[in-house]
Amino acid sequence: MKAIIGHGTWYDKVAVEIIERERRLGRSLDLLRVESGVAASGIPHIGSLGEVARNYAVALALREQGYNSEFIVFSDNKDGLRSVPKGLPKSLEKYIGYPVMEVPDPFKCHSSFGEHMISLLLEALDECGIEYRFISAVEAYKSGLLNEEIRTILENAEKVSRIVKDETGQEKYEEALPYFPVCSSCGRIYTTKAYKFLPEEGKVLYVCEGMEIKGRWLEGCGYEGEADYTKGEGKLSWKAGEFAARWRALKIRFEAYGKDIADSVRVNDRISREILNYEPPLHAQYEMFLDKSGRKISKSVGNVFTPQVWFRYGSPQSLLLLMLKRFVGTRNVSVTDIPQYMNELDELEDIYFGKKHIADEKERAKLTGLYKYVWLMKPPAKPSPHIPYNLLTYLAKVAPKGSETDFIVEKLRRYGYSNLTLTEELKRRIGYALNWVRDFAEIKETSVELSRNEEKAIRDIIEALKTEVKAEKIQNLIFEAARRNGVQPKRLFRTLYRILLGMPHGPRMGPYIVAMGRENVIHSLERALKEGGGSPSST
């Protein structure tokens, strides 16, 4: 068997690949920088956080290999507003083409639209515990961080144009420099066309002639002027050099990117190599999060699922689990997935603390490693009480108003959680369940595939529950139904837990069924028979 690398995860393998690559390139290993570029032009969704979380996990993996790493969050707040995201005021339409930091905040709580949007993402990163060095594009251009790279790119504008055409077929930079000045007359950025570089003066000449944005023509004001790139009076085109400029100026060694910008990354890789003489960072491509209808979750189409929504019903670690458990492939995701990830996090914790045995050493290492990354290498010292999300939401639904927490804790102790204490973690979990019940009627039940023998046993249980009311007798009749139908009792209990709680374990079944209400349990079991029955006999 091959040796396990680091903590056995994909992130550890990438970290080793980065280190070996940097050695081959002969570059310093004193500080290895990882970057995420983040937009400020729309409401940040869970995909925005996903990109940052995955890049940060690589930065952590480099540290776990014994190297200093720094994680940079680069805010694209010099970009212009290309469209008004759905749900925001139509009055913002008049600001299309303006830099997002010059667009007023429609919520009137920040200095600008861009400031508001980036604050939402940074708030989510802080909630997750992600540590980062924040760099604002506005400040980077103004401070001269990218001056050398801008100059080299503008001096080689014809070569940049050929690279863009080779890689994408676009010819727009045959007539324009890959630089957008901010028009000093109307204030827009995308309507300007830079047509001449004055290297001695550090300036470009431009005309504000207009530009097609999102399928419609945005008319320029006609002004002709000059912009000083050394003073941050414009920005590079991100498709034709800005990524490359950042990589070289900041000595970035790794950056993952979304499938939707693959062409731009390919162009920037070549610009970095062929024009800036800097071997670009190692990359990994990830795919998009989709909503349940299969559409890409997007700032502009109105199906935004934000980290803040997730944090109302689930922990930051459960969201990081969604982000980090798999890197490739698109995933359909919605708020209804939160209970599943909360329960899955508990299962990972059982593996990490040795309460659940995984025989395969590599699989065990990968899962315990994933748990560490979900906790950003600061896992808890001891396991927390694992109470199924469905159980908490049921108790939250029937709890008397004003004393919900006391009621839930008392009931849990009666269900067999005898040593339960009201820790901060338990308070948070109860809070998630209470929020769920306030906002949603119930958790969508999951389908469970049943063998024919399990199906027969469940039919027996349904019949018995129509007359039996005592918890202890209900507990015993489940054992009897299992034996009578040739099903291992442990397997039948696991199946019942999956049907009723969405996970393979839970509180003592007899008292739980009484508390849930026999009619409710019968309904759930009948639904399971309808949806999951008919597979071959198995014990």
Language model features by range: what are they?
Residues 79-95, 149-150, 296:
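Charged, often glycine-rich, active-site loop that binds/positions anionic groups
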Residues 260-265, 272-275, 282, 286-435, ...:
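Catalytic adenosine-cofactor/nucleotide-binding cores of aminoacyl-tRNA synthetases and other
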Residues 92-115, 120-124, 128:
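A glycine-rich helix N-cap at a beta->alpha junction
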Residues 45, 153, 268, 315, ...:
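Residue-level signal for inorganic ion chemistry
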Residues 130-301, 307:
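Active-site cores that bind ATP or allylic diphosphates and position pyrophosphate for catalysis
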